[in-house]
């Protein structure tokens, strides 16, 4: 808006929230005000990319068009809806959670079961969103479905393949598709620019999703007799673990990026960034014994710097690359274990998990913010 108002020779003020926006425009003589509110919110990186292209090309193209032609161009962008069917989005969530499972310490059994359960859970969630069901309902139903599916397929695997019950911990990973990474991280970026209304509303939205999801997952765990135990140790060499982490990080970020409605090329670019940044984070924790929160800051900073460098060549919006690439670093496992332990009144463990989660969650947007400060002059100063 700053760039377009400068091109048009007008002054603009805007009040942005999660569900509404109020816009005022002055040209020295007249004032025009517009307001808009929506019933639901979501992420559409493809539309964001087209909007950024519109702004970038405005001085050469749109500035010479009539008002009617500009409205037609904006209408074309507005018509960009979901690029993928619910089945494909379910598959994307399955891939993301499968990669997430390995990165959290799970083995092949947990990965396969999480793949199936997360795919079904997100398929149901996508169907509910498509039919405009309320946020609480789609979170509760999709998380419950994922946990139930994991438990059913684990029991079938025990009966058919004689797999031991040691693999039940993976049920946590099957619901990680619900993690509100985009609002969590963008709320921090908004707060860094003192956009308090937008930042606090996004943060509140993210907290609501986490609370509802973890509470229903806890209830399902009690009903299905599941416990968030530690994963069985994987006996891998350092080199093999490094290679698998790169692959799992790439797959996880690619899946999350597809869920954000990115094109295949945009998702692959974000996955490339995430594979480097997340593997670096995990290796720092393992080999330098760096605290996870500090490693998360370095990982997010790396992702932000890489995205800024790549943006110069392909023009993808920075936020469409950075957020998917670090969503996989959001400690959903820690948050769930915190709520689970609160539920069974194991308060010492709950506070420990919750504190660790908060430290990492704060560090992730902080890393992106400082990467943006280093590489974006307009972000470096108050505007």
Language-model segments: residues:
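C-terminal transmembrane helix-loop-helix hairpin of multi-pass membrane proteins
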Residues: 170-175, 188, 194-209, 272, ...
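Hydrophobic, membrane-facing alpha-helical anchors
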Residues: 58-72, 87-97, 115-125, 221-228, ...
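Membrane-embedded hairpin module used as a gating/binding unit in multi-pass transport
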Residues: 186-236, 240-256
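Core alpha-helical transmembrane segments of integral membrane proteins
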Residues: 83-186, 258-260, 264, 269
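Alpha-helical membrane-inserting segments
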Residues: 99-104, 120-129, 145, 149-157, ...
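Membrane-interface helix termini and inter-helical loops of multi-pass transporters
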Residues: 157-166, 224-238, 341-353
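Soluble N-terminal domains of membrane-associated systems
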Residues: 2-82
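Structural signature of hydrophobic alpha-helical transmembrane segments
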Residues: 103-117, 166-180, 232-248, 288-301, ...
């Amino acid at each position: 808006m700053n760039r377009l108002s400068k091109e048009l020779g007008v002054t603009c003020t805007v009040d942005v929230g999660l569900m509404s926006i109020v816009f005022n425009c002055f040209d020295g003589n007249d004032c025009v005000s517009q307001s808009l509110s929506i019933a639901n919110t979501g992420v559409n990186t493809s539309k964001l990319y087209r909007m950024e292209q519109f702004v970038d090309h405005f001085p050469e193209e749109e500035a010479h068009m009539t008002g009617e032609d500009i409205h037609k161009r904006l209408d074309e962008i507005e018509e960009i809806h979901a690029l993928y069917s619910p089945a494909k989005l379910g598959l994307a969530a399955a891939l993301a959670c499968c990669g997430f499972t390995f990165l959290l310490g799970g083995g092949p059994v947990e990965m396969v079961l999480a793949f199936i359960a997360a795919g079904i859970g997100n398929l149901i969630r996508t169907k509910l969103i498509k039919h405009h069901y309320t946020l609480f309902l789609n979170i509760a139903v999709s998380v419950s479905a994922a946990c139930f599916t994991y438990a059913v397929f684990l029991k079938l695997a025990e009966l058919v393949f004689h797999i031991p019950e040691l693999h039940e911990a993976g049920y946590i990973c099957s619901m990680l598709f619900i993690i509100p990474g985009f609002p969590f991280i963008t709320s921090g970026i908004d707060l860094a620019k003192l956009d308090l209304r937008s930042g606090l509303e996004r943060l509140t939205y993210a907290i609501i999703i986490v609370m509802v999801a973890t509470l229903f997952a806890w209830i399902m765990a009690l009903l299905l007799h599941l416990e968030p135990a530690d994963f069985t140790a994987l006996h891998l060499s350092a080199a093999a673990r490094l290679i698998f982490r790169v692959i799992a990080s790439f797959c996880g970020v690619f899946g999350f990026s597809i869920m954000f409605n990115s094109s295949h090329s945009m998702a692959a670019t974000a996955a490339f960034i995430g594979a480097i940044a997340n593997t670096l984070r995990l290796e720092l924790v393992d080999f330098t014994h760096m605290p996870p929160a500090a490693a998360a800051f370095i990982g997010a900073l790396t992702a932000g710097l890489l995205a800024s460098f790549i943006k110069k060549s392909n023009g993808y919006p920075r936020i469409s690359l950075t957020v998917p690439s670090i969503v996989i670093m959001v400690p959903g496992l820690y948050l769930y274990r915190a709520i689970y332990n609160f539920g069974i009144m194991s308060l010492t463990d709950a506070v420990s998990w919750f504190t660790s989660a908060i430290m990492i969650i704060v560090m992730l947007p902080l890393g992106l913010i400082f990467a943006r400060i280093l590489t974006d002059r307009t972000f470096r100063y108050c505007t």
